[in-house]
């Protein structure tokens, strides 16, 4: 079962921007596109993903964020909602740490679900 991690970015981002910010956590990691590009997976090697960036959506209504993430802090809109998932294992923990660090570079709030 994967763990969901949501990034709420104050500025416009694309999937590649998020993947590049995640890669800063470990310079030995790599990235690969899934499904011809709409999703990107950050991996520690060819067979061990640490976090997958599923997509980015612009959100223009704070009510939508509040409805889906009632514990999220109030942020100005528009914002960019980034969906990611990590494995529920040691690699996934590395992915969560990378997401928390990337949130600083992306001017984002990072919400780790299931913690």
Which residues are covered by each model-predicted region?
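Acidic (Asp/Glu-rich) sequence patches and key acidic residues
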Residues: 1-115
């Amino acid at each position: 079962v994967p763990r969901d991690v949501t990034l709420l970015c104050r500025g416009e981002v694309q999937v590649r921007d998020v993947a590049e910010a995640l890669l800063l956590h470990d310079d030995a990691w790599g990235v690969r596109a899934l499904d011809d590009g709409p999703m990107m997976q950050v991996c520690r090697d060819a067979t061990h993903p640490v976090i997958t960036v599923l997509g980015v959506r612009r959100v223009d209504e704070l009510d939508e964020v509040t409805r889906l993430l009632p514990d999220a802090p109030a942020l100005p809109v528009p914002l960019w909602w980034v969906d990611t998932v990590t494995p529920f294992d040691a690699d996934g923990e590395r992915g969560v740490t990378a997401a928390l660090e990337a949130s600083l570079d992306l001017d984002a709030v990072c919400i780790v679900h299931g913690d």
